[in-house]
């Protein structure tokens, strides 16, 4: 059973303590009623992983853990087999005692695009909305964050996160909660809030921006990364049934339109930090994610378009401040 007691004890002593008015009951309800049919299998994989304290831990340049003496072939095989029980691995990569998890996404590339534009993360309390397996949270800790809290309702991601955490020596500087942002009270407690790869899945994107703002302290920083299309401040794509084979894509604005949305929600100092086309080198099928990936979602005769005929995925990073 994945235990959230350490997180409750941690926030009981800091400025997130008011969250304890609602959080334990929400988690208890989740544990009682909402578990995926494979959750027991996934949580068993985490339980059977060995307790290891890394001799060398690098979260600044990657997510890498190494032992003082190389593990035996049998130990490595055990870790690899258990981690493969948690496939598909979408966000990473991870290098853990000789087991290299080559994930669908090169999330390190995204981090390299985002990091130069951030305010210094040293000592910050961070919320990562839609955090996936938690890769970027570990990189936030590597960049000096005091505490990274991720929320993502996908239960496989929770188990992947807990597996990595266990292999990082049960590191308590990052925590993942199986919640959506709509389940959070207006905490107004985080120095930096990240929302990366979430906005286009929201039926009401402006409501999502307000929800993000409600989590920030005054003067806090929002880091927003999402799909965009080319165009002026009035350009927004509303896809039909699917976009790049995804059913749950609702609004894809231009970067300039997104800037206006942020302004409408009361953010200031809004800047477009990066715009990049997603390549089939950054998102692809691997041994750790064996089903369809980006190359299958693009027009085989014109990779500048999706199979539905829309512009191929392009992503922007916008940085804004809550006054």
UniProtKB/Swiss-Prot annotation:
It catalyses: carboxy-S-adenosyl-L-methionine + 5-hydroxyuridine(34) in tRNA = 5-carboxymethoxyuridine(34) in tRNA + S-adenosyl-L-homocysteine + H(+). InterPro entries: CmoB (IPR010017), Mo5U34_MeTrfas-like (IPR027555), SAM-dependent_MTases_sf (IPR029063). It holds the Pfam family Methyltransf_9. GO terms for molecular function: transferase activity, transferring alkyl or aryl (other than methyl) groups. It comes from the Bacteria. The keyword Cell membrane does not apply. The keyword tRNA processing applies. Keywords: Transferase, tRNA processing. Its EC number is 2.5.1.-. GO terms for biological process: tRNA wobble uridine modification. Gene3D superfamilies: Vaccinia Virus protein VP39. Carboxy-S-adenosyl-L-methionine binds at residues 91, 105, 110, 130, 152-154, 181-182, 196, 200, 315. Homotetramer. Catalyzes carboxymethyl transfer from carboxy-S-adenosyl-L-methionine (Cx-SAM) to 5-hydroxyuridine (ho5U) to form 5-carboxymethoxyuridine (cmo5U) at position 34 in tRNAs. Belongs to the class I-like SAM-binding methyltransferase superfamily. CmoB family. This is tRNA U34 carboxymethyltransferase.
